[in-house]
């Protein structure tokens, strides 16, 4: 609730809101506000709580270590100790997450699975940024990228840096032009990876 209050204040403090622009520009601008990283908040509540708030605010779901249920309702975020709930899985299907929010993931140490499905703001630079996160490089085991139209071969190739990755599913990615080359890159970089391609 406190986070939404802060966002509301940011919205109302702006001198000029782009109402005159088309709605697509407005929504992109609003999604940028939702993705903005509040480093003080991360310090106050810890990386897992702050990342949970960001992901749920953007329409994604999280699952915590030791829990079977996914959490999607921002108002049902658990309270208590900052060390109690650790994100184990992220499902960003139909969410508005974008690269400027990825600093929320820096302190996460237990994320084993990520699904990026129909994420309109996921581009090559997002995947490159993901592959630079040291903690994620160690913990991530499964990754699915589905129907993210702005992803190309360049972004996917960066995923070879996830040395512990066991499963990678790529589907409905029209920006990928050379799936044979991708398969070759991953076979060489990650020989134990189960790579599933559903690409044209």
Swiss-Prot record:
Family statement drawn from the similarity comment of this UniProt entry: Belongs to the ATP synthase subunit s family.
Role according to the record: Involved in regulation of mitochondrial membrane ATP synthase. Necessary for H(+) conduction of ATP synthase. Facilitates energy-driven catalysis of ATP synthesis by blocking a proton leak through an alternative proton exit pathway.
Transit peptide as recorded in UniProt: 1-25
Major localization listed first in the record, in broad terms: mitochondrion
SUPFAM superfamilies: RNI-like
Gene this chain is encoded by: Dmac2l
Cellular location(s): Mitochondrion; Mitochondrion inner membrane
A GO molecular function held by the record: metal ion binding
Assembly, per entry: Homotetramer. Associates with ATP synthase.
InterPro entries, per the entry: LRR_dom_sf
One of the GO biological process terms: proton transmembrane transport
Family annotation (Gene3D superfamilies): Ribonuclease Inhibitor
Biological classification of the source: Eukaryota, Metazoa, Chordata, Craniata, Vertebrata
Any one annotated GO CC term: cytoplasm
Stretches the record annotates as N-terminal domain: 1-61
Record keywords: ATP synthesis, CF(0), Hydrogen ion transport, Ion transport, Leucine-rich repeat, Magnesium, Membrane, Metal-binding, Mitochondrion, Mitochondrion inner membrane, Repeat, Transit peptide, Transport
Signal peptide: none
Presence of the UniProt keyword rRNA-binding in the record: no
LRR repeat boundaries on the chain: 62-87, 88-116, 117-141, 142-173
Binding site for Mg(2+): 59, 93
Protein name: ATP synthase subunit s, mitochondrial
Domain of life: Eukaryota
